[in-house]
């Protein structure tokens, strides 16, 4: 199976104006500005096969939006090789642009003061969609996303959920092979999220649509994606299947530690932290004045309980869902 996306040694560096202190420094910066580099992406390598649905996960500032813009051809990488559907995205070739769609949840491609239908009709002409195909696809999209009564309203009068669903409709009208979704469900109600997730899964089965999805709502990732890529500080930290990610998560538990007698003070917690260093491969994800929380491999739980069974500490294993696991990963990496 040929690859949908190929990235090799991709770097993206921005140059930001240096901060200044004092009037003289500000005037100098105004006349002769100086800049400092900011590495948004560092040696990014991964491949995505055709027909895949990939969840691209990372905290704010991790490099997700920069990478999406590079994959769409909006930005060029500073260095490295990018191939999407066999094309160099930065060349913005017509053959490439006709094969992709892109929805940015915080931006609109619709004309603000005109009815949604006007934007859809215009895109029909831009992409040279046949009348019969246009009517069929528009009918399917409006029925599936509950937009029949919406597309004749001006965009400015739509709710956020209605607007995002109209954006999705616009970007699927020309039947792209690949759609990029950058935070498509941010701020949406439960019903709108469900309709979008359901339709994306339907299109994947019906027309082998490939999906590259970034979202802080991990419910989107769990519902729509088979694979996941996790990025942090511009570097890829995980690239594999959702099943592999679940196996990693199941190998760890969250352990909460507190003092049975709070009058013993922080010194006892400090003693606990020092003692835990012998295990090496555990992460402290919460360091509070009265309790500690660790991400601990399951195989070490029994040994830890045996070590601290003198009645000084309360040890509690806490439940973890997918979102908790991802958040704890980010916390453990931030301390590195």
Language-model features, listed with the residues they occupy:
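Catalytic Walker B motif of ABC-type/P-loop ATPase nucleotide-binding domains
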Residues: 179-183
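C-terminal coupling/interaction segments
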Residues: 295-336
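ABC transporter nucleotide-binding domain
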Residues: 197-295
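Conserved ABC ATPase "signature" region
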Residues: 24-28, 121, 125, 132-150
């Amino acid at each position: 199976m040929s690859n949908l996306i190929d990235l090799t040694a991709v770097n993206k560096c921005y140059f930001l104006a240096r901060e200044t202190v004092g009037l003289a420094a500000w005037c100098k910066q105004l006349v002769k500005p100086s800049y400092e580099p900011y590495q948004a992406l560092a040696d990014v390598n991964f491949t995505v096969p055709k027909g895949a649905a990939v969840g691209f996960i990372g905290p704010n500032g991790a490099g997700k939006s920069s990478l999406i813009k590079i994959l769409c051809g909006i930005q060029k990488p500073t260095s490295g090789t990018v191939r999407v559907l066999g094309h160099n995205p930065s060349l913005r070739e017509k053959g490439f642009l006709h094969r992709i769609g892109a929805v940015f949840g915080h931006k609109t491609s619709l004309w603000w003061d005109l009815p949604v239908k006007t934007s859809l009709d215009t895109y029909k002409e831009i992409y040279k969609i046949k009348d019969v195909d246009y009517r069929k696809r528009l009918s399917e999209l409006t029925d599936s996303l509950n937009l029949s009564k919406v597309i004749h309203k001006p965009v400015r009068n739509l709710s956020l959920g209605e607007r995002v669903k109209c954006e999705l409709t616009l970007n699927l009208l020309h039947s792209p092979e690949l759609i990029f979704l950058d935070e498509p469900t941010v701020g949406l109600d439960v019903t709108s999220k469900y309709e979008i997730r359901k339709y994306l899964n339907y299109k994947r089965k019906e027309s082998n649509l490939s999906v590259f999805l970034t979202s802080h709502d991990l419910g989107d990732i769990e519902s729509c994606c088979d694979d996941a890529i996790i990025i942090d500080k511009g570097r890829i930290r995980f690239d594999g299947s959702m099943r592999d990610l679940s196996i990693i998560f199941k190998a760890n538990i969250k352990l909460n530690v507190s003092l049975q007698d709070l009058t013993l003070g922080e010194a006892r917690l400090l003693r606990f932290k020092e003692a835990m260093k012998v295990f090496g491969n555990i992460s402290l994800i919460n360091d509070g004045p009265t309790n500690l929380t660790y991400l601990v491999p399951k195989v070490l739980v029994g040994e830890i309980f045996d070590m601290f069974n003198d009645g000084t500490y309360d040890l509690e294993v806490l439940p973890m869902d997918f979102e908790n696991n991802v958040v704890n990963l980010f916390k453990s990496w931030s301390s590195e």
